[in-house]
Amino acid sequence: MKTVNILVEALPYIKKFHRKKIMIKYGGHAMIDEAAMDSTARDTVLLKYVGMEPVVVHGGGPEISRAMNKMGKEPKFIEGLRVTDEETMEIVKMVLVGKINTSIVSKICYHGGRAIGLSGKDSNLLLARKRAPHVVRDDETGERREIDLGLVGEIESVDPGIINMLTDNNYIPVISPIGVDRDANTLNLNADTVAGEVAAGIGAEKLIVLTDVPGILEDPSDPDTLIRRISVDELSDLVKSGIVEGGMLPKTLTCIQAINDGVSSAHIIDGRVEHSLLLEIFTKKGIGTMITE
């Protein structure tokens, strides 16, 4: 009887989101734990089979750093941004496109989905420009200086054509966060930003970001202070007050921007919880934080 009740509870959401695009950002535990990735891939396929149109963007920062260390190249970061020279860019492409993307595609296909891997270079999906030099301030002298981050980009535009073509033909696009500039140079992009920009570009109903925390917390040190629903204005106030910080800040800002760009709702959920995707979409209570206008 419990199973029947679960199915009945899910029905209104299945009807509401039928034929709607759902952007899913794979990250955190769902990227490094085989069982978690397998579970997330299975849930993604289920969304497709009940009539939704999932689109996946993945990151891969820790995997890139591990690959660099194996090759004897030390990863360098400036205030959380990876310095990307040409050699590093080759490693980034190898890990994101050659390893992580193909792994996600194969898992989705194993569970009965029809996944196709893409990068932002395919069909000029993600047109980008080189990021301006990053300005840092010396705490002792107060002197400000510019540091060139190399082949790090920021998105200029999203061409949704190839994604729409794939979803219209029952495929699940899986996108690596790599862009291309107007001179055909490859650029390293932030995966959270890519997920938000693509979600807006394809008119997604939802943006769901998988992380390693329960969601947005009133007290970052207490998982019991989960905020289950919050408006963009309320969330912006939390950002200004410093409650949202560290690794959650870019994810939160991505969600705010996505809502402002027309996505109906954004969700930050714990990818370590089995079937977290399904619990967030198909239950009234959800499992993480839902952000709305």
UniProtKB/Swiss-Prot annotation:
Any single GO molecular-function term of the entry would be: ATP binding
Q: Which UniProt keywords apply?
A: Amino-acid biosynthesis, Arginine biosynthesis, ATP-binding, Cytoplasm, Kinase, Nucleotide-binding, Transferase
A Pfam family this protein belongs to? Answer: AA_kinase
Question: From the record, what ranges are coiled-coil?
Answer: none
List the EC numbers from the record.
Answer: 2.7.2.8
Q: What is its main location?
A: cytoplasm
Checking InterPro entries in the record gives: AceGlu_kinase-like_sf, AcgluKinase_fam, ArgB, Asp/Glu/Uridylate_kinase, Glu/AcGlu_kinase, NAGK-C
Gene Ontology BP annotations: arginine biosynthetic process via ornithine; L-arginine biosynthetic process
Instruction: Name the residues that bind substrate.
Output: G60, G61, R82, N188
May I have one GO cellular component term?
A: cytoplasm
The places in or outside the cell where this protein is found are: Cytoplasm
Q: Which family does it belong to?
A: Belongs to the acetylglutamate kinase family. ArgB subfamily.
Q: What does this protein do?
A: Catalyzes the ATP-dependent phosphorylation of N-acetyl-L-glutamate.
Annotated protein name in UniProt: Acetylglutamate kinase
Its taxonomic path starts at: Archaea, Methanobacteriati, Methanobacteriota, Methanomada group, Methanobacteria
Whichever gene encodes this chain, its name is: argB
